């Protein structure tokens, strides 16, 4: 099997896709930080067939070490795939910068509409969704620390120019304004732009940043998890992670959501603030219905959207690129 070098620092990545490759019997080396010794271990000693980078990979490291990594990878003819996990909002500022810096052989993107942008650059490109890792995203006993009616895990926007703004106003605003038992984790909520967004979030609802390792506990402890979406044509990682955990997901009915999941079977969708209030009231009172949908959602992502399946897609893509 192919040997996989996975270059990522954040647990939100290292606890995901690498497990999928392991389940396909691919040896995996996780490279979290760059130094001369770590590059030697990852490239010269491990001798990978495929290197995967992603996200804002160019920002954490010095140019010297990045060039050393790509030079060594090229020397041993390692196939380099960049996974564009910040598309489409940050394609120019993030993905294109990473491509310029790391010079990958091919690109996979979470946004189907961005595929042709990479092909126009002369790079083989395909779509690859996020997924779930059943070894991490799974049922576990509730934790009283996270016992809330409604929770939201996700960062507040910087400029709120994407569909994420609409998601917040449909899902979060009506519940905050009515004083529901809500907890919000993530960056920048303490600098929330009240004037732009049209409502104020009480400070007791804002809980700060949450280690990724804690997220599954939250999903298993809260009764309803709000799932913001950033774009009509892509799905956030938390969509799959919440469902994989067995949590009940309330999101918005974007094209991508309704393409993969059935409303009130795998998750629930609110099209307006009024929908959100009605659905939250209903599902807080109807525990059995809420739990049945959560079980269905977990079953669906375990069947079709695990990182084992995503790893298989990457291997198939790499084989296709090699043949062409």
Task: Map each language-model feature to its residues.
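Nucleotide-sugar donor-binding catalytic core of glycosyltransferases
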Residues: 1-46, 55-68, 106-240, 248-258, ...
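Active-site charged/polar residues at nucleotide-handling catalytic sites that mediate phosphoryl
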Residues: 45-46, 102, 305
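Active-site proximal beta-strand in glycosyltransferases
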Residues: 73-86, 106
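Membrane-proximal helix-turn-helix segments that form the acceptor-binding/catalytic region
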Residues: 91-105
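Conserved acidic donor-binding segment of nucleotide-sugar-dependent glycosyltransferases
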Residues: 267-273, 282-287
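Catalytic phosphate/metal-binding cores of nucleic-acid and nucleotide-processing enzymes, i.e., regions
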Residues: 276
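A short, well-ordered alpha-helix in the C-terminal region of glycosyltransferases
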Residues: 289-303, 313
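C-terminal alpha-helical cap of glycosyltransferases
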Residues: 307-324
